[in-house]
Amino acid sequence: MLAKMIDKIVSLKETKIFEIDGQTYADASLTRIPPHVDRPDCISVSGLDSICKLIRTELEKVGTTIMVQVKSNDTVEVMTTYLSDFSRNTLYRAKADAPGLRTGFRGREVALIELRSLCIPNEGTAYLLDLLSRMTNENSVSTNDNGVTQTVEARQGVALNAVVDIKPRVMLRPFRTFLEVEQPESEFLLRVDPDEGIGFFEADGGIWKLEAKKNIADYFLKNMGDLIDAGKVVVMQ
């Protein structure tokens, strides 16, 4: 009797599989079991040129329309259009090796190095390099900030050799997107603090990211125009 009860309990716990309209279900909660589909591994690269070469090399093998999505200022993903099961294959992904310019405060020497190594030279970098080159380390400091300009008479920490009106905003072009496209120029808020040092803060609300995405999309339009016109490649922002 006990053995029959155990057999009954075991049979009740056994999962039964049903085929309904070509789909596979389990009897517990009728959860769909998706079929296994062999998919290619996503290839990761760091440049837009590599994406173009991969698409041209493997387009015929893919056998369907390819979607190029500019996801952000430093990321591009390439995927197929809908397959027969309404899924997509992510084929390639590009991530820019762009250091960018960290927002926040840093020391004078670090600021000098970052302006020379992380930014494309322009009027903004020339102004900042000249300003920083006239700073010294002394024993006291006084500041006057009216919200438009900041005046620093510096004699301690980050210090100036004279009373100078500091521009509150400067235009900089840090390396923030793929090197194959133009680096966007944007406003940065400049702050000088006797204790914290030199501060750079983005001041354009992220508009530069939209410009970077447009530059990336334009790169693909220029380098894969024939495939785009033929409807084989679609570029999205």
What are these regions (language model features)?
Residues 108, 121-125:
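The transition from N-terminal targeting/processing segments to the mature protein
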Residues 1-115, 138-237:
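C-terminal assembly and membrane-engagement modules of membrane-active proteins
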Residues 116-120, 134:
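Alpha-helical transmembrane spans
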Residues 124-139:
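Membrane-active amphipathic alpha-helices enriched in small hydrophobic residues
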